[in-house]
């Protein structure tokens, strides 16, 4: 099973650049060049995300990223997609339907300092 996604496109192909969230985004941080979380305790947030999404009938937006300071553009695009897929698959295993997920790959970014802070998957609930 593969969760498909494209840069700035949701699973249904629509543009996701104008997404407005409900509540606060949740970040999952990853090790360098990996889809392994820095700390597995971060996964405790998934149960609450699933509970709220189901109770409030919300869509879950997933954005994967890599730090642009390491790796090539191609490697970072691939890595950011795999990070988003990883979190998406975990949400599906916890009972979220694929139709409720919108996933994007941000590729390599340098938005945050230190550079390790750019190795993430962000989860945002939306109406």
What are these regions (language model features)?
Residues 1-59, 117, 121-127:
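Periplasmic peptidoglycan-binding/tethering modules of Gram-negative envelope proteins
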């Amino acid at each position: 099973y593969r969760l498909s996604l494209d840069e700035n496109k949701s699973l249904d192909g629509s543009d996701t650049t104008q997404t407005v969230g409900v509540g606060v985004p949740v970040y999952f941080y990853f090790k360098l060049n990996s889809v392994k979380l820095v700390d597995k305790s971060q996964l405790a947030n998934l149960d609450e995300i699933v509970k709220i999404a189901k109770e409030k009938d919300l869509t879950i937006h997933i954005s994967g990223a890599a730090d642009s300071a390491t790796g090539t553009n191609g490697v970072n695009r691939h890595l950011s997609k795999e990070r988003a897929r990883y979190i998406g698959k975990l949400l599906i295993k916890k009972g979220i339907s694929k139709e409720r997920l919108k996933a994007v790959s941000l590729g390599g970014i340098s938005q945050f300092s230190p550079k390790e802070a750019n190795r993430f998957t962000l989860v945002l609930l939306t109406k």
